């Protein structure tokens, strides 16, 4: 029963004027059937995916961040302290042949709070009452029906935000025949009073919305029935609500001006929104780490265009960044910072860790001026940021352990400890992909573990496929307990690092 073939998505539209399939006990409201589709997933799968869709409205709308559940009759969990309860009670409906099982009120949180306001919405779950279904030849009820109701807390279509359909209510109905193991899913709309025959109702748009809602159920229902297992877990280190609220705040404050003033040749939107997301994550991470104590400062190694450093400093976090090459953007992002070697927040430096044995450069290798070098030693406690730092990525947990500094590493391109491009061994977990990126992430995590770090992994909510964040904020070993030279040898050694660093002086900056 779990291996039924998924049918192609070919919904059937109900013709205009079709009789309602849902009837309220009050007998007044007229629910309009919009479309339906055959399904091979049973009631328990429908109930499971509908609860997930209620808790995660972003699966249905790109305009939404999330939903905060502010009322749940079946839950004894307290409402989060930062969620304000409205005086509106749940807006439920009673349907003929159904018993209400659960009632929730969720607050829809939009991505753009400057354009759209949050909206409270009642969500209710129903099951058909015993004896209310069709009977088989033996006189037994053979049809199971499950219904989910959505009622926005708005008195008219004009008071609904952009991201919500201009309807008074939405119902999604699942019907399952236990004998034939065949079912249907359908979508139904309730229009606002006086608008049933009004010209202002955009039937074409409502049809598209119903199609999309049905398609989402079809996709997730068959995935659940087939035993789909989610591979990626977000919001492990920082709660989703806090990250999204901070990201929305930063985006509203800085995004427009940063995009308009972009000096690089790379795509401004990608870099601006990506770094705003990383900044939001770091700010909320630091909120937990440094509650009640002074922030120790940060250093962004391989800082690139310097935008992340700039955003964090605008938000009041002291720190600096360095890179092998100066960027155009530094002219507008650079500021004074007494904690850096030059007194500037952005500066050109080559990383030559003090732990690396001194090499005698050959005739073809450019001699590096000592004033252009940083030895990778930082004040104890400084938070190290390594965002797509490429050659510096595997060095991040090593430098962090030597200086006893917490860190975040967001890997991108694969380099070994000498700075050469290479492909790391496949991940230890055989269930993970064997791609070059997955291999790099696991390899860097292994280095971190050997340096004593308790590594936390966060899949960052940023517009990048390279969004894995490795966080080290707790080290189980003292620096004196770690044989760093043995660690370097275990992971390939460092012979040739000096000449590879010297080459960076001649190369063109990368655009990621």
Swiss-Prot record:
Top-rank taxon, per record: Eukaryota
Recorded catalytic activity of this chain's protein: uridine(44) in tRNA(Ser) + S-adenosyl-L-methionine = 2'-O-methyluridine(44) in tRNA(Ser) + S-adenosyl-L-homocysteine + H(+)
Localisation per UniProt entry: Cytoplasm
GO MF term set: tRNA(Ser) (uridine(44)-2'-O-)-methyltransferase activity
One Gene Ontology term, aspect cellular component: cytoplasm
Top enzyme class: transferase
Annotated keywords: Cytoplasm, Methyltransferase, S-adenosyl-L-methionine, Transferase, tRNA processing
Enzyme Commission identifier(s): 2.1.1.211
Pfam families, A to Z: AdoMet_MTase
Presence of the UniProt keyword Methyltransferase in the record: yes
Coiled coil spans: none
Biological processes annotated in GO: tRNA methylation
Family according to the record: Belongs to the TRM44 family.
Function: Probable adenosyl-L-methionine (AdoMet)-dependent tRNA (uracil-O(2)-)-methyltransferase.
Protein name per Swiss-Prot or TrEMBL: tRNA (uracil-O(2)-)-methyltransferase
Organism: Gibberella zeae (strain ATCC MYA-4620 / CBS 123657 / FGSC 9075 / NRRL 31084 / PH-1)
């Amino acid at each position: 029963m779990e291996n039924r073939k998924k049918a192609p998505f070919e919904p059937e539209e109900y013709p205009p004027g079709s009789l309602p399939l849902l009837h309220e006990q009050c007998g007044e409201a007229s629910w309009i059937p919009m479309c339906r589709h055959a399904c091979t997933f049973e009631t328990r799968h429908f109930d499971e995916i509908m609860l997930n869709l209620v808790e995660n409205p972003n699966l249905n709308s790109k305009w939404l961040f999330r939903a905060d559940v502010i009322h749940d009759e079946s839950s004894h969990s307290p409402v989060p302290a930062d969620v304000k309860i409205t005086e509106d009670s749940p807006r439920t409906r009673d349907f003929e042949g159904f018993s209400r099982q659960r009632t929730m009120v969720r607050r829809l949180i939009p991505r753009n709070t400057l354009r759209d306001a949050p909206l409270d919405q009642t969500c209710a779950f129903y099951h058909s009452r015993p004896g209310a279904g069709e009977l088989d030849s033996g006189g037994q009820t053979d049809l199971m029906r499950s219904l989910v109701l959505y009622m926005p807390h708005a008195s008219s279509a004009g008071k609904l935000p952009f991201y919500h359909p201009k309807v008074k209510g939405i119902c999604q109905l699942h019907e399952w025949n236990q004998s034939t193991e065949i079912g249907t899913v359908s979508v139904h709309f309730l229009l606002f009073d006086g608008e049933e025959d009004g010209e202002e109702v955009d039937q074409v748009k409502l049809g598209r919305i119903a199609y999309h809602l049905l398609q989402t159920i079809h996709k997730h229902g068959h995935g659940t029935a087939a035993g789909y297992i989610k591979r990626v877990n977000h919001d492990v280190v920082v709660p989703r609500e806090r990250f999204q609220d901070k990201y929305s705040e930063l985006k509203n404050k800085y995004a427009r001006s940063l995009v308009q003033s972009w000096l690089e040749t790379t795509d401004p939107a990608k870099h601006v929104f990506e770094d705003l997301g990383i900044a939001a994550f770091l700010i909320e991470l630091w909120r937990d780490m440094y509650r009640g104590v002074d922030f120790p400062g940060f250093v962004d190694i391989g800082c690139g265009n310097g935008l992340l450093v700039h955003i964090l400093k605008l938000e009041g976090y002291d720190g600096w960044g360095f890179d092998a090459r100066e960027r155009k953007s530094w002219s507008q992002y650079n500021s004074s910072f007494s904690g850096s070697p030059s007194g500037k927040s952005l500066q050109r430096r080559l990383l030559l860790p003090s732990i690396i044995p001194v090499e005698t450069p050959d005739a073809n290798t450019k001699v590096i001026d000592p004033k252009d070098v940083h030895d990778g030693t930082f004040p104890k406690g400084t938070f190290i940021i390594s965002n797509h730092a490429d050659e510096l990525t595997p060095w991040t947990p090593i430098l962090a352990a030597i200086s006893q500094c917490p860190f975040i590493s967001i890997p991108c391109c694969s380099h070994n400890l000498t700075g050469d491009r290479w492909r790391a061994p496949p991940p230890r977990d055989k269930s993970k992909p064997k791609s070059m990126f997955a291999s790099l992430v696991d390899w860097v995590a292994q280095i971190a573990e050997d340096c004593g770090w308790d590594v936390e992994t966060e899949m960052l909510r940023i517009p990048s496929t390279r969004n894995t964040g490795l966080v080290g904020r707790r080290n189980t070993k003292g620096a004196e307990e770690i044989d760093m030279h043995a660690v370097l040898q275990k992971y390939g050694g460092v012979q040739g690092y000096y000449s590879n660093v010297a080459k960076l002086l001649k190369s063109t900056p990368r655009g990621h």
